[in-house]
UniProtKB/Swiss-Prot annotation:
It holds the Pfam family CPSase_L_D2. This is Carbamoyl phosphate synthase large chain. It comes from the Bacteria. Residues 133-327, 671-861 form the ATP-grasp domain. One of its GO terms (cellular component) is cytoplasm. It comes from Lacticaseibacillus casei (strain BL23) (Lactobacillus casei). ATP 1 binds at R129, R169, G175, G176, R208, I210, E215, G241, V242, H243, Q284, E298. Its EC number is 6.3.4.16, 6.3.5.5. The large subunit is composed of 2 ATP-grasp domains that are involved in binding the 2 ATP molecules needed for carbamoyl phosphate synthesis. The N-terminal ATP-grasp domain (referred to as the carboxyphosphate synthetic component) catalyzes the ATP-dependent phosphorylation of hydrogencarbonate to carboxyphosphate and the subsequent nucleophilic attack by ammonia to form a carbamate intermediate. Residues 930-1060 form the MGS-like domain. Mn(2+) 2 binds at E298, N300. One of its GO terms (biological process) is L-arginine biosynthetic process. One of its GO terms (molecular function) is ATP binding. Its cofactor is Mg(2+); Mn(2+).
Length: 1060
């Protein structure tokens, strides 16, 4: 059937901010879908709240709205735009749930708007646990014995009937949010309560646990003519019981027989047909290892994390095809954009092994619960491709960027056998490294399989890697063995370690012996048809499929996996850099390892190398491609860390030189720059050991801000108040960055702001200044930022502009640079300079309508800023007020403190824009999911230093109608100021009233700042944890509370008695 002619305008719903469970994969799928619809001639309107995405660029849709993804705001857009249809299936769970809510309000019927792709009945049947169970029974597809519960009592009744353990799965949530495995009544009550709170329909499924079964996924597509295909099948390394987003995943399936694959394939196709889904769908199965018995776990009736992985694993662009199917095209009418010869109805074939490894945030949350279960905890993922499972797995390990190039944590060698066995039994984020350690101790496959419940096939592969390590250690400089281990994915650095050499010597040895990687194409058809996809992976075989182009090229290093501190913002900058390189007439080459992102869509760059971002892998690509140079400033710290080793080996780094990068990053060199320019800077110093650090702090006076050099996202950064705290910090954190000293600054209290500038070495352009709402001491990535500044005098703005221009010129910056300031006593103090793209680049690009990364790239390639139409200085403010607000994923992680400080904790961001600050703040809070009641009870418990300021805020909360509850110390301060307040007992008095009131919804807002007294901080931690667990809005900064008051005051009408 040809595409539909009766619809012309389509609204696409995006997925909002990046949170655990819903990451950059939806920017990739959303961008693909919008472009596919425009390709077919439709007018596309996009709504999304996340400014850090390519999807929200003006060229992706005909009109782009960066607005909160709520019924209130999207209804307003629908009434204004009057689209013919909505495509809700590429915005993840957020998009699906919003479509359901819009339908329930009646606005779609009122305006005659239809849902494309997947009908509401199908969404309901797949997402509503009871309807899904009924459908599966009707299809004779087995599901685990289960019951629907709408309250804790119902959940307990079913568990009592079938016995523990049970799995709890909330309805209409993603990433396993609110779910878990309960082994007893106490765990059941906790998990069920959380799941019911987080389910938008207050419903959970309680099912018999099938933990231990193999977990297998099928990505399927169907069109309106009922043609259906399997795009990809995937097998989880971890058995059922660990969320698939947290498991290592292999494609295609590795341990299934042909009969098992056909059985599950038939079931997946039967299910997608029964649901009448038009587009993409993900079906998850649990398969018994010892029989053909299986269960259907769940169905995602939309584009998902797994479909992004399947797209990159096969080269088959699922979201693009799904969008075309949604407007009526059939699979046999859509050309496969990879081969350009076959049709979309041909199922992809793989002649390689793909490994996906999750990236966890526990480097940021050292006290977090690392146990893995049915609720997802990973922030991002990496993918690697190889000809053998071992090669694919080892490439994936070194893509993770966790300080390892091989599955070996030296510290694990010190564990006792008992400790090691305990870690293998319990699924956690480092289980792969524990398993490898077990084989280094000669555990048998049977012993490890018994402890871990892992499939012996996968354990055998890990054991093989350990056996090859031993072979290398026993046969130093054996060239035949060198060729063999390279085929199995060993890094030069690991070989060098085992041979007592430097990695460069191993590399030289390989080159002399012609042991070189070749590059194979990802072509969807295992080489059956000719293909010209410029999408490659390395392996050690004889023939290569990638040939150097005659055209001069530039290599851009991507930013690797999404993690806290290095998010999708850097992928945004990478993609824009590629566009500018192409505009300048060069061939653009990307190297990256992240399957979720737009940058690894094969249609973006002229060539894509899906490879680990290590020195060895980058040099291999450079050897083949011989680019004019390498751009590192858009890939975050991942790329910046490669600059010096590349330059040392004669590779040209384009943009700011390595020497100047070091002058900005090295504390002593940077201090010299600041002093030479006579710029104000907090007093500080550097130390390489504990004694030196204590001496520096003593000299400049406490409190001090301490951090390692060369880090991103405030890694291991803390405010320290005395010598004891500093002593503890050095013991914990100085080893974070072995080769660089610890930096110590006097901590100034004041307003913080930042600026991104672009320079060509002469002209320096400041597109805008962003004022932070939270004062200095909270990481810039966790602060709300306002453009243009609202409280700065012209003198302060002039100081910031002047200092930024001087710094840029003195550091010979070419490209982008980010500078952060504290405003203290009327002076702008420079606190940090980052000579690269920062996480604010997408936000500033959107609000100023200047594509910063493109302008910067053209400057790097030699097109002066004057030729691009810019002069030195701060550009005039654009219309409107724009607020960038952080979004956190605390509810997904146990035992993680939500108190904000100098180390970054947010996973994503949203933007609110309007004509006044209060309105823009309201939108930002709504977009971030912080829905504020206009009245209720606010619990305020603050440290002594904050009491005066908290008292002023408390008065304003009373004015807008809030009742106040406070612990004794805070309550006394309020009563002294004549404020009505109820006193509540502290937790250390043995009373749990505070936690009970939060749990029972008797508190609507919590404001909690922490004292340095560890006993009080433990109270504070428990209060914050309770607020997050029960979905109560929580502020850990009085500045954020002040911003919330602006919103509440905007909504409140004033009431007062008339004067007598």
């Amino acid at each position: 059937m040809p595409k539909r002619q009766d619809i012309h305008k389509i609204l696409v719903i995006g997925s909002g901010p990046i949170i655990i469970g819903q990451a950059a994969e939806f920017d990739y799928s959303g961008t693909q879908a919008c472009l596919a619809l425009r390709e077919e001639g439709y007018e596309v309107v996009l709504v999304n709240s996340n400014p850090a995405t390519i999807m929200t660029d003006t060229e992706i849709a005909d009109r782009v709205y960066i607005e909160p993804l709520t019924v209130e705001f999207v209804s307003q857009i629908l009434r204004k735009e009057l689209p013919d249809a909505i495509l809700p299936t590429i915005g993840g769970q957020i998009g699906l749930n919003l479509a359901m809510k819009l339908s329930n309000t009646g606005i779609l019927d009122e305006l005659g708007i239809e849902l494309l792709g997947t009908k509401l009945t199908a969404i309901d049947q797949a997402e509503d646990r009871e309807l899904f169970k009924n459908l599966m029974q009707k299809l004779h597809e087995p599901v685990p014995e289960s019951a629907i519960a709408n309250n804790i009592e119902e959940a307990q009744q079913f568990a009592d009937k079938i016995g523990f353990p049970v799995i709890i799965r909330p309805a209409f949530t993603m990433g396993g949010t609110g779910g878990g495995i309960a082994n007893n009544e106490k765990e059941l009550a906790e998990i069920a309560e959380n799941g019911l709170n987080l389910s938008p329909v207050t419903q959970v499924l309680v099912e018999r646990s099938i933990a231990g079964y193999k977990e297998v996924e099928f990505e399927v597509m169907r069109d309106a003519a009922d043609s259906a295909i399997v795009v990809c099948n995937m097998e989880n390394f971890d058995p059922v019981g660990v969320h698939t987003g947290d498991s290592m995943v292999f494609a295609p399936t590795q341990t299934l027989t042909d009969k098992e694959v056909q059985m599950l394939r038939d079931a997946a196709l039967k299910i997608i047909r029964a649901l009448k889904i038009e587009g993409g769908c993900n079906v998850q199965f649990a398969l018994d290892r010892n029989s053909f018995k299986y269960y259907v776990i769940e169905v995602n009736p939309r584009v998902s994390r797994s479909s992004a992985l399947a797209s990159k694993a096969t080269g088959y662009p699922i979201a693009k095809m799904a969008a075309k199917i949604a407007v009526g095209l059939h699979l046999d009418e859509i050309k496969n954009p990879v081969t350009k010869k076959t049709w979309a109805e041909f199922e992809p074939a793989l002649d390689y092994v793909v490994t996906k490894l999750p990236r966890f945030p526990f480097d940021k949350f050292e006290n977090g619960d690392r146990t893995l279960g049915t609720q997802m905890k990973a922030t991002g993922e990496v993918m690697a491709i190889g000809r053998t499972l071992e090669e694919s797995l080892l490439k994936a390990v070194r893509s993770l960027e966790v300080g390892l190039i091989h599955p070996e944590r030296p510290a694990f060698a010190k564990l006792s056998d008992d400790e090691l066995s305990k870690q293998i039994i319990q699924a956690n984020d480092e289980r792969l490294f524990y398993l490898a350690e077990a084989f280094r101790r000669d555990y048998t496959i049977e012993e490890v399989a018994e402890l871990s419940k892992m499939n012996p096939f996968f354990l055998d592969k890990i054991k093989h890697i350990v056996e090859l390590e031993r072979e290398l250690a026993a046969h130093k400089a054996d060239l035949g063995l060198l060729a063999e281990v390279k085929r199995y994915g060993f890094a030069d650095e690991e070989i060098a370690k085992l041979w007592g050499l430097h990695a460069d010597q191993v590399r030289q040895m390989r080159k002399e012996q012609k042991i070189l990687p070749v590059y194979k194409m990802v072509d969807t058809c295992a080489g059956e048809f000719a293909s010209d996809t410029p999408y490659y992976y390395s392996t050690y075989e004889s023939s290569t499929e990638s040939v150097k182009s005659d055209k001069p090229s530039v290599l851009v290093i991507g930013s690797g996996p999404i993690r806290i501190g290095q998010g999708v913002e850097f992928d945004y900058a990478t993609v824009h850099s590629v566009k500018a390189i192409q505009k300048a007439g060069y061939e653009a080459i990307i190297m990256n390892s992240n399957p979720e992102t737009v940058s690894t869509d094969f249609s973006i760059a002229d060539k894509l190398y899906f490879e680990p971002l290590t020195l060895e892998d980058v040099l291999n690509v450079i050897d083949l491609e011989q680019p004019e140079g390498v751009i590192v400033q858009f890939g975050g710290q991942t790329a910046i860390n490669l600059a010096e080793p590349l330059a040392n080996r004669g590779i040209k780094i384009l943009g700011t030189s390595v020497e100047d990068l070091n002058r900005a990053e090295d504390r002593d060199l940077f201090d010299q720059v600041i002093k030479s320019l006579k710029l104000p800077q907090p007093e500080g110093g550097t130390a390489t050991d504990k004694a030196g650090a204590l001496a520096v702090a003593d000299k400049i006076g406490y409190p001090v801000l301490v951090r390692p050099s060369y880090v991103l996202g405030g890694r291991a950064m803390e405010i320290v108040h005395d010598a004891t705290e500093l002593d503890n910090y050095i013991d914990r954190a100085v080893s974070v960055s072995h080769d660089h000293p610890v930096l110590i600054d006097h901590y100034l209290v004041g307003k913080e702001c930042e600026v991104d500038c672009i320079s060509d070495g002469d002209t320096v352009v400041l597109p805008g200044i962003m004022e932070h709402i939270e004062r200095a001491g909270i990481h810039s990535g966790d602060s709300m930022a306002v453009y243009p500044p609202q409280t700065f005098s012209q003198d302060i703005i002039d100081q910031i502009t002047d200092a930024t221009i001087k710094l840029s010129r003195t550091l010979n910056c070419i490209g982008l640079m980010n500078v952060q300031f504290i405003i203290h006593d009327g002076k702008a103090y420079v606190i940090e300079v980052n000579p690269r793209a920062s996480r604010t680049v997408p936000f500033l690009s959107k609000v100023t309508n200047i594509k910063l990364a493109q302008v910067a790239t053209l400057a790097i390639l030699g097109l002066s800023l004057k030729e691009q139409g810019f002069e030195t200085g701060l550009l005039p403010n654009q219309s409107g007020i724009h607020v960038k607000s952080p979004v956190f994923s605390f509810s997904k992680l146990n035992h993680v403190d939500s108190l904000l400080g100098p180390e970054m904790k947010s996973t994503g961001e949203v933007m609110g824009s309007d004509t006044t600050l209060a309105k823009a703040l309201y939108k930002a809070f709504e977009a971030a999911g912080m829905h504020l009641p206009q009245f209720g009870r606010a619990l305020i418990t603050v440290k002594d230093a904050d009491k005066a300021e908290a008292t002023a805020l408390a008065k304003r909360f009373r004015e807008v109608g809030y009742q106040l509850v406070a612990t004794s110390g805070t309550a006394k301060a309020f009563e002294k100021a004549g404020i009505t307040v109820s006193t509540i007992e502290k937790l250390d008095s043995g009373q749990e009233t505070i936690l009970e009131d939060i749990a029972n919804r008797k508190i609507q807002l919590v404001i909690n700042t922490m004292s340095a007294d560890k006993k009080v901080s433990s109270d504070g931690f428990r209060i914050r944890e309770a607020a997050i667990e029960h979905g109560v809005p929580l502020m850990t900064s009085l500045d954020t509370a002040g911003a919330i008051l602006k919103v509440l005051e905007l909504q409140a009408f004033s009431i007062s008695p008339i004067k007598s």
